[in-house]
């Protein structure tokens, strides 16, 4: 593991945001010892920016994911908190959900560099976010710039953090809209009541206005991984199509763009499916949500989440 010359002393984020225009990696990570959040930018493997951001104490338990837009880097400050002192109490955990702590978003202007200060945008609700869908900027009818953030939000969470298990509460898909100048919450709406999580998008649209999100159905699975995937239109706010995994369970339907694709949904969804008996690699047409191929693997693969796709050019660059 690379600590980048000792600058990164804590954990690195599970979900760096890669700017599709520059290839730079933007990451937010939680430093549990200090309670701070670190924001780092890597360009071609070199650390080009690093900043530590103090949090209210007790600190947010996790910053597992964040947002990147054309001009902003955004991280959530969440109602799931971390307090090591809690773990010394009988049957207690260092993690606890504080419904009195309102969720907010820390917004940094990317162009300000080392002079950037965090602006806090209040979400007007308590909540916890594991994974984000996307964020972008829009100009409203009056010419004001709005910051749009979309993510599944949990409004409760047990202290034993039972992620990917039947004890995990349900998340609901929310869209937040803020005035970027004032930080005021313009609109907040729940798009889906059904439990969808671990979203996927065409990352060529990361930070841009995104129409399509691919959401893992965790309600139909009884909380054990995902039972299928939903294609959802974020602009019309309507479900388009879904694909059911049947007796299998999946971890994340990863979007892979087709070569020379023009349209946002021109590509594939790749999913690793597992049952009690075997495992299979599933390939769906992301435009039609129909099955293209299914390859039964020679050995059952245990349940897992998250993955990445490397094309032949990227693989060759790693081998160079």
Specify the residue positions occupied by each region the protein language model found:
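Beta-propeller domains
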Residues: 1-320
């Amino acid at each position: 593991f690379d600590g980048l010359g000792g600058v990164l002393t804590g954990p690195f984020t599970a979900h760096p945001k890669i700017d599709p225009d520059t290839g730079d990696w933007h990451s937010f990570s939680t430093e549990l010892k200090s309670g701070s959040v670190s924001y780092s930018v890597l360009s071609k493997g070199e650390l080009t920016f690093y900043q530590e951001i103090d949090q209210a104490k007790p600190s947010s338990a996790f910053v597992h994911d964040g947002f990147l837009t054309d001009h902003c880097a955004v991280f959530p400050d969440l109602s799931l908190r971390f307090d090591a002192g809690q773990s010394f109490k009988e049957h207690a955990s260092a993690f606890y959900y504080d419904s009195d702590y309102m969720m907010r978003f820390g917004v940094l202007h990317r162009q300000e560099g080392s002079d950037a200060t965090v602006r806090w945008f209040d979400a007007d609700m308590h909540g916890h976010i594991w994974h984000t869908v996307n964020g972008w900027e829009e100009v409203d009818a009056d010419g004001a710039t709005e910051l749009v953030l979309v993510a599944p939000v949990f409004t409760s969470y047990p202290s034993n953090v039972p992620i990917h298990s039947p004890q995990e509460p349900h998340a609901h898909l929310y869209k937040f809209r803020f005035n970027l100048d004032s930080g005021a919450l313009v609109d907040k709406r729940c798009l889906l009541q059904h439990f969808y999580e671990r979203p996927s998008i065409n990352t060529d649209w990361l930070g841009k206005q995104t129409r399509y999100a691919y959401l893992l159905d965790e309600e139909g699975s009884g909380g054990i991984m995902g039972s299928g995937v939903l294609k959802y239109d974020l602009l019309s706010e309507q479900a388009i199509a879904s694909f059911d995994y049947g007796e299998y369970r999946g971890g994340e339907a990863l979007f892979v763009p087709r070569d020379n694709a023009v349209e946002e949904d021109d590509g594939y969804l790749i999913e690793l499916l597992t049952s009690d008996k075997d495992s299979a690699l599933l390939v769906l047409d992301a435009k039609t949500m129909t099955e293209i191929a299914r390859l039964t693997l020679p050995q059952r693969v245990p349940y897992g989440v998250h993955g990445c796709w490397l094309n032949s050019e990227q693989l060759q660059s790693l081998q160079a």
